[in-house]
Amino acid sequence: WEKPMEVMHNKIEGNIEYTSLLFFPAHAPYNLYHSDYEPGLQLYSRHVFIMDKCKDLLPEYLRFVKGLVDSPDFSLNISRELLQQSRELKLIGKNLEKTILKQLANTLKKDRSKYEQFWKEYGKSLKIGIYGSVYNGGSDVVNKLKDLLLFTTSKEDKLITLKEYVENMPESQKKIYYATGKDRASIDSLPQMEILRDKGIDVLYFLDNVDEFAIEVMREYEGKPFHSISRGDLDLDDVESQEVKKETETIAKSNEDLIKDIKETLGDKVAEVKISSRLKSSAVCLVADEQGPSFAMEQAFADANNPMFKARRILEINPKHDLFARLQKVHEQGKESTAFKDYCSLLYAQALLIEGMMPEDPSAIANKIAELMAKYCLLYTSPSPRDRG
């Protein structure tokens, strides 16, 4: 037995009377988010046991809360069906929800380390609550939970609230940027991070599958819209970014045939090929269309055996990378040349791998890489003395 993380004892008298003893277990049970987990509080009337797991007292996002409620307003022989319709039960439930959320807000404000421990164990429940508000509770649930969320960022490997993120935003920043990945290292290495890092813009790190789904429901925080660094344009409004954008448009116009032929070569693997204004040192990246699902969402749906939701893939190429100049040169041989097709395939495969996705035919890609390496070796390996002789 471990001491509970939090204990709340309340005795309420008035129009409705009840005593509650609630607690958060020290650790989340292994099956908290599985279908076999049974949430609910014990229900008593005048110290007489009525029900073991009453699910109707607390919302689903507080399923981790344990404890009991004792109220004289319940009949001892009330059926489960009548209990679900009970006005008293609903009033008690609303009061309990307020009590718990108030306690969490106070802990966040007065004992940050304790709240972070709570977040580590049960934060996912609150995020699932926001995502589930689409079907139950709507904006009311979002407003209750949004200030309790914590995330790490590109600048700080520590948890911060959305309010703290917004307070630290430069005045010129109009959006809350976020990135998804399995861990910090995988996000740090994303090509899309380069320009934001250079400009000192902080990025929220979403490391849990449910994070982006919850944010999609929220849409914005304090008037600042959320924006994935891997979806659509970054919409950076500073002078330097606008100049780069104009330069990129000029390069794209002078390379229209090349871009068109790359798209033709890749076919329906990509929806669009673009000259990138966001890449700094990387040759290529994949971004998703702003209106559709992200790559992380696509993967989450696939993991849930629902592969119907696909991100609209846009291949972005860095015009200042050496590979772009090489691609232009190879394109002069014609779009049907083997070299041009190989370069297009390898650039797309590289973009997939950066996003943590596998090419459709890894073996074919490996063979193309081996062929290019062999050609490179022939070009740069000096003849042996025997060859000279």
Question: What residue ranges belong to the model's regions?
Answer:
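Conserved small/polar residues in nucleotide/adenosyl-binding loops
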Residues: 380-387
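Conserved GHKL (Bergerat-fold) ATPase module
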Residues: 1-379
